[in-house]
Structures are given as structure tokens and as C-alpha cells.
Amino acid sequence: FKSLKERKIINLKSPIILICSKNLLIKQMEKLNYRFSIQILNRKNIKKKYLNNKKINLIDVNFNFKKPFDKISKKSKTYIEECVNVALNLIKSGNFKTLINGPISKTHFLQKRMPGMTEYFAKKTNSEGNEVMLIFNKDLAVSPITTHLHLKKIFKKITKRNIVKHVEII
């Protein structure tokens, strides 16, 4: 919400699609006293021409919750998995190229099967070895040469070839 509020949703250059529970989003907006217009999208037929850059474009994923802000637990794993799968299907459709994920509990979602979401998305999109992370704010953008690695393994991955490949991907 903070990013949306700071950028003033009415001035977005590109539309944003949120994939989450409509009811949860509304309850969280009420709690934070935010007001944004929401446009519900049909997840079966999403095309760029249907998107509105003056509203939150929302793909609704059902989630039963008690409190709008609660600790992440195992019960949210299925919900997160469905949201991620919807996002991956949008990317695989070829209509969308960019995916920005919010905070996801690696402990509950990945359950130590992978080091991070970057590697998870790379595996699901058959692009292992070509994954990059971009960390940015309004003043700075950084893209680490490696993704989630133990410190002792990082030095082996920082080579001229890997740096060039990384820059080409970005």
C-alpha cells in the first residue's frame, strides 16, 4: 500500500495487477484508511487492453482469514501458492513480462526446498541459470550478480562471463 500511496495510483504509467483476496485487500485498506478504486479482472481472460492504470486491477483469490493483518502461518501456504500460480500463468501466457512479488515467507511456502523465490520462479518458468533479482527504490536500483547463495559460494560465481550475462539479462 505504501508504494501505491506514494506513487499516487492515478499517475501510474503502467497498470498494476494485484493477485490477492479482494476481501482481505478491502479489510486491510479500511484498517489503514486507504482508498483506492478496484477493478476486478476475470482471471480466464486477462489482456492488457482491459487494464486500467488509474485503478488497482485485481485478480481475486479466495482466502479465509480472521484478522486483516495476522502472522504468516502454514494455513496461508495454499493461498500463496494459488496467487503465485496465477502470476506464473500470466507470465507464461506471453502477455506479461514483469513479476514483482511481495514478501513471502520462505519458511512456510518454500519449506527449505529452494533458497528463495527468485530460484522458485526460475524453476517454474524453465529459466534456471537466467534468473536475476532487482532491488530498487526511488533513489537507487541494485541487481546482485548472484541470487540466494551461501557466502562461501559467491566468489566462485562472480566471473567476467557471469557479470556480462547478468547485464545482458537485465
Protein language model features and the residues they cover:
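Anion-binding alpha/beta catalytic cores of soluble intermediary-metabolism enzymes, centered on
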Residues: 1-170
